[in-house]
Amino acid sequence: MKNLLLGVFTLCTTFLSAQEYHWTAYNFTVAPEDLEIVGKLVGDYFGAEGNKAAGVSVFLFENHFSDNGMNFSHSLIFTGTIDAVGAQYALDSGAKWQLFLTKMNRYTNDYSSAAGKSVISYGKPGSHPIQNLYSMRIEDQTKFAKAFTKYHSKYSPSDRRVTLGRVGLGRSPDGETHYILVGVDDFKTAMSSGSYRENNKAAMAAWKEYWENTGEVKLIRSSTRVMLGKW
């Protein structure tokens, strides 16, 4: 965990640019018997005054539904503007931070890390606890974003958040370049996220048109994560 965090913290300031929000993700495995300890370590550290920059949100997620190529149990994710994330990195160099990393290292095994940014978002802002993540390789971001915008600006349900984003650092050998993140409030919606189109012929036709106009796209994998905490 310590090596993952330090490595991406060093690279991140060269990557971020001022659009929507930026994120860094650190994936690791925790034994079930140690999860309560790890959750408390994260909550105690980022919940304490002075350990989190203004405008930064910190999330702990459980990796709930995934294929065997995503062999980790949890993710620690930071989001914010370029200025907020930059300020967070400036904080993370003192003795308290080093002690936090040392403690985390006792209970976690590193898996991977990545950094990226959102490009376009639609729907209800907020911290939706259930999130479906679709990793893709997109050949033409401009073309895909145009089709994404045309559909979601009109048909995306108001009770969720749908985001098109880009992976900038830490791409896997599978070659994902982008992702779509769908945040919802319950598992029923997560497991039937397209059901709102079933009795809406216009939405069905628009969905078909959307995917006919995205350019070349390959789905790399899909997964579902569950929010355990936010600070």
Give names to the regions the model predicted.
Residues 18-231:
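Short S/T/G/P-rich N-terminal loop/turn motif that feeds into the first structured element of a domain
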